[in-house]
Amino acid sequence: MSLAELRLEDLRCLERAQLALDPRLNLISGDNGSGKTSLLEAIYLLGRGRSFRTRHTEQLIRHSAPRLWVHGRTLPEPGHTVGIKCDRDHGMQIRIDRAPVSSRAELSEVFPVQIIDPGIHRLVENGPSQRRRWLDWAVFHVEPGFVRHWQSYTQALKQRNAALQSGADPTLWEPELIRCGEALTLARSRLMSELQPHWAGARDSLGAVGASMSFFQGWSRDFTLAQSLERHRLHDQERGLTSMGPHRFEVLLRLDGRAVREILSRGQQKLLGVAMAVAMTRYIAQAARRTPTLLLDDPAAELDIARTEALLGVVRGLGAQLVVTALRPEQTPLGMPNAVFHVEQGKVKRL
């Protein structure tokens, strides 16, 4: 899948832009601060319903504008149209094929997109929440019913926590919590197992350290989820929240028995983060028969020449639509771009 057309208004420093993208390699050049990364944000917004730079979408609105608007059209034909409007006062509105949708998950179904940017080390360095989103995004693409189970589990978890805090009976919500929680855990565990060869291949081809990747389900494997909820019920009542369950799952990255974020440099963490993105792109392409569009924001940042060339070599072999930023076109040795755009002072033109 790929993005054929991007149109936007009032996103960060970009007042208005329209790009006809190629399904292969697209290069966006321009000085720092010109708006290159903002174009990637617009594309990412179409596939994820959020920015990769901030949790607050309203921060993307150009300072003098009341709202932003982004529109995209996907391939292959007949494709889909995606429209997103974000208003300072009324939040975000999403439309797919002109019909309003309430869930951002529906965006990923029509336009899957991944980002490799200078901050990708945070996928390794930060706490578990980013790795949870990374894994669940992929599970959504390959497991029918995952979103439905996730929504039901989240609702049951809220109700159980409310009961724990109010002194009501928390067991009323446990059957639904267990039913949906076990389905979530099975789907996540299965994907993690199937992902392993893609992870090892991406990690090794990039020359990253040989870190292992494993899955912690959110409670001890010595007990069922029902047993774990029962064992921790008194503790949960004292704390007013559910301490064990699929909402506490983690993707663990370890080297010699230690968490890699404790022992690796920023550059090494970045390589592992890139390997995670590449591995997931390969997996989705194989398992879901759809190849995500891959965004690369300044791929040479913080990597030496050898590692940059290794990254670009791996990326070239994915068969994905690529949208890459660089200060100058010659700084991205990916071969001849199929489309080149230049951004200057918030204005975009095709070269």
Predicted regions and their residues:
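Conserved lysine of the Walker
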Residues: 36
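Structural recognition of the conserved hydrophobic beta-strand(s) that form the central parallel beta-sheet
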Residues: 72, 320-327
